[in-house]
């Protein structure tokens, strides 16, 4: 499973990139989505690589985001009690493990697929450079560090 965070805005963006960001449901800066690992999403990430940070996510990271930023329709918070009501899982942790394994999806239970994050504490290292150049754009070996800064 990949975690993708939009870091750059829409000004002077090519239409193909804007459309791809829209298909990924990344309409605003600092929004995050989790997508499964397949060639379709990999191609979409390749198109928008200069506008997003992305990396492999695990169940621990998804659990943290669901607890902190998980929302249902009506902007209700996601808690263990709510998870017990809307799904066969007993906790957010079990739900996150099932989603990472591919046994369930957030959409099945009415959980909003987009997570609205804060700007990172202590700031970005730069949104015009890739990770290799000392910035934030592109593939992160540990995307969890960036997401924890943006929690």
UniProtKB/Swiss-Prot annotation:
Entry superkingdom: Archaea
Keyword Flavoprotein found: no
Record keywords, A-Z: Ribonucleoprotein, Ribosomal protein
Entry-linked InterPro entries: Ribo_uL30_ferredoxin-like_sf (IPR036919), Ribosomal_uL30 (IPR039699), Ribosomal_uL30_arc (IPR005997), Ribosomal_uL30_CS (IPR018038), Ribosomal_uL30_euk_arc (IPR035808), Ribosomal_uL30_ferredoxin-like (IPR016082)
UniProt entry tagged with the keyword Ribosomal protein: yes
An individual GO BP term: translation
PROSITE patterns registered for this protein in UniProt: RIBOSOMAL_L30
Disulfide bond positions: none
Any one annotated GO CC term: cytosolic large ribosomal subunit
MF terms in GO: RNA binding; structural constituent of ribosome
Pfam family, one: Ribosomal_L30
Family recorded in the similarity comment: Belongs to the universal ribosomal protein uL30 family.
HAMAP family the record matches: Ribosomal_uL30_A
Assembly description: Part of the 50S ribosomal subunit.
Name listed for the protein in its UniProt record: Large ribosomal subunit protein uL30
Organism: Methanothrix thermoacetophila (strain DSM 6194 / JCM 14653 / NBRC 101360 / PT)
Gene name tied to this protein: rpl30
